[in-house]
């Protein structure tokens, strides 16, 4: 069982997850021409919070995650809410090719968990239809205190470094904008702030 499997059932109890998703959804709506003809993919969809917020703005969303626990929660949400344009899928793009194209690929707080950033950007590019869009929300470079010790993740990202990787993959019109800030307290009850960017690019 992965760590995400073990926390799937309680994930939505943290209000930050909903607040962050709302901020990202609002920024995506402002920065991208979302419409009901779009077929979208959320990669690393977790419990589907962001996809549910965007479900009325898009035609169809494939909610993909490699955690069985997270996908089970998404399936229950879709059934309980009778949402017909959301499809939960358990799949890992880092390991296998997914033979479908999309008008929009988006994710939040997923990129720092992916080892080979250049490879996943190329995968996203190849999965986009001509003129399609990419939207990625993640941490700016941080000192490692966001996740703490013994977690194998990237410590946030320098936007300029990501720009180079995106252009190398074939993307154009790469833009970054701060969209949310996470506030956390350390062991000494001191507050620390972690800004999150929204990256957008087009094929």
Mark where each language-model region is:
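Conserved class I S-adenosyl-L-methionine
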Residues: 1-35, 50, 73, 135-161
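Class I SAM-dependent methyltransferase SAM/SAH-binding core
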Residues: 41-95
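A conserved beta-strand element that flanks and buttresses the S-adenosyl-L-methionine
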Residues: 106
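Short catalytic micro-motifs in class I SAM-dependent methyltransferases
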Residues: 109-113
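A short glycine-rich, Lys/Arg-flanked "PGG" loop and its adjoining helix->strand segment in the class I
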Residues: 118-130
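Short alpha-helix
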Residues: 155-170, 176
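Core SAM-dependent methyltransferase catalytic element
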Residues: 182-203
């Amino acid at each position: 069982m992965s760590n995400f499997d073990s926390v799937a059932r309680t994930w939505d109890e943290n209000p930050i997850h909903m607040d962050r998703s709302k901020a990202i959804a609002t920024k995506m709506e402002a920065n991208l021409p979302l419409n009901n003809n779009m077929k979208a993919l959320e990669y690393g969809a977790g419990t589907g919070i962001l996809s549910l917020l965007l479900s009325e703005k898009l035609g169809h969303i494939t909610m993909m995650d490699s955690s069985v626990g997270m996908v089970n929660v998404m399936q229950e949400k879709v059934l309980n809410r009778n949402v017909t344009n959301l499809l939960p899928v358990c799949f890992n793009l880092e390991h296998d090719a997914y033979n479908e194209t999309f008008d929009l690929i988006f994710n939040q707080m997923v990129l720092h968990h992916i080892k080979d950033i250049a490879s996943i950007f190329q995968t996203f590019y190849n999965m986009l239809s001509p003129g399609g869009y990419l939207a990625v929300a993640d941490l700016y470079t941080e000192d490692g205190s966001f996740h703490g010790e013994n977690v194998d993740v990237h410590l946030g990202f320098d936007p300029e470094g990501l720009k180079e990787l995106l252009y190398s993959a074939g993307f154009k019109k790469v833009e970054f904008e701060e969209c949310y800030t996470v506030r956390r307290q350390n062991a000494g009850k001191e507050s620390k702030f972690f800004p999150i960017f929204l990256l957008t690019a087009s094929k």
